[in-house]
């Protein structure tokens, strides 16, 4: 491992030890804000510190094994120990390189997830409903909270569009690669000839932004309309114009929110989604520029990019970005998404490592 990387790891390890000592200090415990900040930093440093400690131990094991090679009686055992230690050292080195990759500050944030039916009419709306259920099941498995902000239901079920806020640890970091086009191939319930139809949906995942990072939005650039909520809401539904539709005139972005009975609360939520969408558009524009100079896993950020195909007759799901095919469609639709998410995260990390190597 390069000496510059070892020096960086040593500094992080020392900071980890320093933070650990500070967390046990009475003055820190008395200051709750400082205690929370240091606790977060400690959690962020722990994986690096633990992995670096293991790597240092392996280097010592390698030195010991090399010294044993000079002893004829110990040589065979030393060769085996040396081989095992070097293999473990290589694995730890790879882990440390990944842990040192620049972190996306948005990864730990909550996320807004939008699912929209595309081509395919009623079948696309039904598939949008299936996708949203899939994400909801995945969220439940990770103990995240799902809150529907707006839902435009299809005529025969599913959704023409549904927007939800998903809250929990690391939501955006896990779901951000879901943004893009999702295609389904199956026989619709209304198909009497048994022919397979192809329909499509688009998914957009955006981090929820703290107030301080919201883009500046001029109130004069907004057109705000109120209308009666059309979703489930018990006896009060359709009695007041509590639902909100906000149009950002410079970009043409439109956001609706009809979750709350309070017009004020719906407006606040809609503005939050609007801010996230405006920032997402800016990020996509920047990624498009970066993609012109090197291959970028996220493509141009264009939502028409084809991420996955879900083929029901074959029980197959294919991620076209990394040429991954699994015959475990039923599990995926029940929210077991880590088998699809983890490979794309690893591919992204490999791209980051390659980019860093090019810079060196």
Curated annotation (Swiss-Prot):
Keywords on record? Cytoplasm, Methylation, Protein biosynthesis
Give the region (Disordered) as residue ranges. Answer: 285-314
**What InterPro entries would the database entry show?**
PCRF, Pep_chain_release_fac_I, Pep_chain_release_fac_I_sf, Prokaryotic/Mito_RF, RF-1
Where is the protein found, in the record's own terms? Cytoplasm
- PTM notes: Methylated by PrmC. Methylation increases the termination efficiency of RF1.
Q: Which GO terms describe its cellular component?
A: cytoplasm
Where, per the database record, does this protein carry N5-methylglutamine? 235
Q: Which GO terms describe its molecular function?
A: translation release factor activity, codon specific
Q: What does this protein do?
A: Peptide chain release factor 1 directs the termination of translation in response to the peptide chain termination codons UAG and UAA.
Write out the similarity annotation: Belongs to the prokaryotic/mitochondrial release factor family.
Q: What is this protein called?
A: Peptide chain release factor 1
> What organism is this sequence from?
Klebsiella pneumoniae subsp. pneumoniae (strain ATCC 700721 / MGH 78578)
Per the record, the gene is prfA
